[in-house]
Regions:
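Structured C-terminal helix/loop/strand segments within mature extracytoplasmic catalytic/sensor domains
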Residues: 42-51, 55, 158-159, 163-164, ...
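Mid-domain, small-residue-enriched loop/turn segments at the edges of structured enzyme/sensor domains
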Residues: 59, 133, 154-216
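Active-site SXXK
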Residues: 81-109, 144, 283
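Bacterial Sec-dependent N-terminal signal peptides
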Residues: 1-44
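Conserved catalytic neighborhood of penicillin-recognizing serine enzymes
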Residues: 116-154
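Short, well-structured active-site flanking segments
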Residues: 96-116, 163, 218-222
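Beta-lactamase-like hydrolase cores
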Residues: 40-81, 257
Length: 305
């Protein structure tokens, strides 16, 4: 499996697991003195990445950022449908609103029965189908991020300025190659609508890097979102599936429906990975127009992690 260790300066971290010591080779990029070696390693890694995707019927885009620097990209020139990855972007915008407005995470929102759309993925609706109850912003974010609940996401859009406000917030962070036009319910109306919300792998990785490296809002709000990402239950067989034990990671996945001919429009994973020495990198692996089954697509993503 690829562990990004080819273009990183190798570090050795010993992790105690039960009664055994497991040695994990991890990576930390040396940007200054090892320029030639890094360039060589990037080329070698790119070759390995290309080998992973060469025979796959899909377009695969990859971006890795370490220490705030664009470490490596592959097929980054295309517009990749975001799918539910945009729930992470939305969460940043919502938390910014709470922070700037002095509102707590336990601010309550009234959830109507009409907010709980029936033909979409929604553990929230399944647990309280009758609707007409109050729920805190914290709980709605938990449903939206950790469970990727589509109704929770749209309720947050409804009460925090819609998709346009989230896109505007991204532009304010310097993220230019991004469009967030439709909410989850609207995306279900057509294939074109599913494709309309797009970004590039590098821009997605940048958003995660900005969140980790900058004080966008209070420490408590930042810690709250980071914990939600770590607790995310979706996509265990994607980036997370390719990582060794002893590594902390948080992520947001996004997966589409299939077209009438069976093509998967998009299947994505955006993550941060914390190595045993505390260093972090962000990685985005976006797959689109895949004529492969879900297991194969997940395998592609996990190999790249």
């Amino acid at each position: 499996m690829l562990k990004l260790q080819i273009f990183f300066l190798l570090l050795t971290a010993e992790i105690k697991r039960k009664d055994e010591m497991k040695r994990i080779i991890v990576a930390a990029l040396l940007f200054c003195c090892w320029g030639a070696s890094v360039a060589f390693s990037q080329n070698e890694l790119r070759k390995e990445l290309e080998a992973v995707i060469r025979d796959k019927k899909a377009r695969v885009g990859v971006a890795v950022i370490y220490d705030g620097k664009d470490t490596l990209t592959l097929n980054n020139e295309y517009r990749y449908p975001m799918m539910s990855v945009f729930k992470f972007h939305q969460a940043l915008s919502v938390l910014n609103d709470l922070d700037s407005g002095g509102l707590p995470l336990d601010t309550e929102i009234f959830v109507k029965k009409s907010d709980l759309h029936p033909d979409t993925y929604s553990p929230l609706r399944d647990s309280v189908p009758q609707g007409n109850f109050d729920m805190t912003v914290a709980e709605l974010l938990r449903y939206s991020i950790t469970l990727s609940d589509n109704n929770a996401c749209d309720i947050l859009f409804k009460h925090f300025g819609g998709t346009g406000k989230t896109e505007k917030y991204m532009k304010g962070l310097g993220i230019e190659k991004i469009v967030i036009q439709f909410d989850e319910n609207e995306m279900h109306t057509s294939v074109d609508a599913e494709r309309a919300n797009w970004t590039t792998p590098l821009e997605a990785a940048k958003v995660m890097d900005i969140f980790l490296r900058n004080k966008l809002f209070s420490v408590s709000l930042s810690d709250f979102l980071e914990n939600l990402l770590i607790c995310t239950s979706t996509g265990a067989d994607k980036i997370k599936g390719g990582l060794p034990s002893g590594v902390i990671m948080g992520h947001k996945t996004g997966s589409s429906s299939r077209t009438a001919r069976g093509t998967k429009i998009a299947d994505n994973d955006l993550a941060f990975v914390q190595l045993p020495d505390g260093k972090r990198y962000t990685i985005a692996v976006f797959v689109m127009d895949a004529d492969e089954d879900d297991k194969t697509i997940a395998g592609i993503i996990s190999q790249i992690s």
